[in-house]
């Protein structure tokens, strides 16, 4: 997907005018350009090489990366939601560098999104790329569309999960994953 900086700048300027602001005042005159550059930066961060390793000593237990901090934008209100992602997988023939799990989260989070789909997209992508015995993804997030508008009740977490393979089919694997996520 290509970013159209000019359209973004025009849209931000129109938005500012639409809410009664003067887009030419000192604090706002560079805002359209800043927002366009931000989306260009997001687009660059979404592209990465999912380097996989097939020689890893036959490790066949759970690999878990906890507390991956993320932020995204609610596609309904364009307000942030943010929190932590926990990803686990059980290798079959391939493993990933741990940083690639963080990059996977970032790649799917840096666009207008809903948490439920974000959870599914991360799990589906890792299942496709790693071909593991199973994948588990849990996301805990606070949504500013609930905290600063509507019900205006900050501090609540929404928790979503996506389970694939043995994480879905084997209750013991699922329980181990959820206990490790909770830190028990």
From Swiss-Prot:
Look up the coiled coil feature and give its residue ranges: none
Instruction: Output the InterPro entries linked to this UniProt entry.
Output: GTP-CH-I_C/QueF, GTP-CH-I_N, GTP_CycHdrlase_I, GTP_CycHdrlase_I_CS, GTP_CycHdrlase_I_dom
What's one GO MF term for it? GTP cyclohydrolase I activity
Give a GO cellular-component term: cytoplasm
Pathway participation: Cofactor biosynthesis; 7,8-dihydroneopterin triphosphate biosynthesis; 7,8-dihydroneopterin triphosphate from GTP: step 1/1
- The UniProt annotation places Zn(2+) binding at 74, 77, 145
Q: What class of enzyme is it?
A: hydrolase
Q: Biological process (GO) annotations?
A: one-carbon metabolic process; tetrahydrobiopterin biosynthetic process; tetrahydrofolate biosynthetic process
Q: What is the reaction catalyzed?
A: GTP + H2O = 7,8-dihydroneopterin 3'-triphosphate + formate + H(+)
This protein's UniProt keywords? GTP-binding, Hydrolase, Metal-binding, Nucleotide-binding, One-carbon metabolism, Zinc
Q: Which Pfam families does the protein's record reference?
A: GTP_cyclohydroI (PF01227)
**Assigned EC number:** 3.5.4.16
> Which superkingdom, per the lineage?
Bacteria
Q: How does it assemble?
A: Toroid-shaped homodecamer, composed of two pentamers of five dimers.
Q: NCBIfam families, from UniProt?
A: folE, PRK09347.1-2, PRK09347.1-3
Protein family (similarity comment):
Belongs to the GTP cyclohydrolase I family.
Name of protein = GTP cyclohydrolase 1
What is the primary gene name for this protein? folE
């Amino acid at each position: 997907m290509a970013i159209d900086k000019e359209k973004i700048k025009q849209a931000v300027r129109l938005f500012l005018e639409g809410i009664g602001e003067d887009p030419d005042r000192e604090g706002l005159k560079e805002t359209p350009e800043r927002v366009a550059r931000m989306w260009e930066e997001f687009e660059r961060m979404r592209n990465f090489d999912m380097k996989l390793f097939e020689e890893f000593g036959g490790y066949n237990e759970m690999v878990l990366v906890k507390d991956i901090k993320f932020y995204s934008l609610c596609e309904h209100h364009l307000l942030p939601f943010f929190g932590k992602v926990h990803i686990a997988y059980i290798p079959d023939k391939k493993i990933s560098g741990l940083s690639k799990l963080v990059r996977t989260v970032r790649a799917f989070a840096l666009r207008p999104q809903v948490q439920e789909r974000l959870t599914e997209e991360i799990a589906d992508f890792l299942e496709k790329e790693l071909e593991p015995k199973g994948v588990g993804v849990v996301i805990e997030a606070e949504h500013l569309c609930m905290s600063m508008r509507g019900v205006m009740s900050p501090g609540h977490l929404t928790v979503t999960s996506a389970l694939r393979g043995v994480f879905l089919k084997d209750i013991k694997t699922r329980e181990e994953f959820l206990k490790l996520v909770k830190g028990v």
